[in-house]
């Protein structure tokens, strides 16, 4: 009888653990589907819930940043991008999004630093970096000219 109870307990534990790992994956996948359907508030809730179960999931932070970008909350967007990069320093999409924010803030030094990192890790979005660097070239001389006239 004692062995039988242990077997039942072990079975319940195994089922419980497997359903927990399934739910972790399910939160992200369900959130991603909601994000694609532009249901950002619901998606944000599930991405945040996924982070509770899987705090080292850089993609959840990346998609939270994308949601905050849509909502024009740059502070939260930047925070989530920085967190995604702490977890995955080679996340080219997070690097690219941070470069765009730095460019928007006229933080050209940060754009250059991020661009140097981006060039080392880019696989799919390499052309985007060229566009950012080109716009940086067009802006910097104007800034230098205005400073020299002062």
Residue ranges and their predicted role:
Residues 36-37, 70-71, 104, 138-142:
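Register position in tetratricopeptide repeats
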Residues 50, 83-84, 117-118:
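Canonical positions in the second alpha-helix
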Residues 53, 87, 120-124:
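Structural marker of alpha-solenoid helical repeat scaffolds
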Residues 63, 97, 131-135:
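Canonical tetratricopeptide repeat
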Residues 112-150:
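Terminal, low-structured helical/coil segments at or just beyond the last alpha-helical repeat
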Residues 57, 91, 125-126:
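Residue-level recognition of tetratricopeptide repeat
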């Amino acid at each position: 009888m004692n062995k039988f109870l242990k077997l039942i307990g072990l079975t319940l534990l195994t089922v419980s653990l497997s359903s927990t790992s399934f739910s972790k994956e399910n939160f992200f996948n369900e959130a991603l589907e909601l994000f694609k359907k532009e249901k950002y508030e619901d998606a944000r809730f599930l991405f945040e819930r996924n982070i509770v179960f899987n705090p080292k999931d850089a993609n959840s932070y990346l998609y939270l940043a994308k949601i905050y970008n849509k909502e024009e909350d740059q502070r939260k967007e930047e925070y989530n991008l920085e967190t995604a990069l702490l977890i995955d320093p080679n996340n080219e999409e997070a690097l690219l999004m941070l470069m765009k924010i730095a460019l928007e803030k006229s933080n050209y030094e940060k754009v250059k630093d991020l661009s140097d990192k981006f060039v080392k890790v880019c696989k799919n979005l390499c052309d985007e970096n060229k566009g950012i660097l080109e716009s940086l070239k067009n802006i910097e001389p104007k800034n230098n000219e205005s400073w020299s006239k002062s």
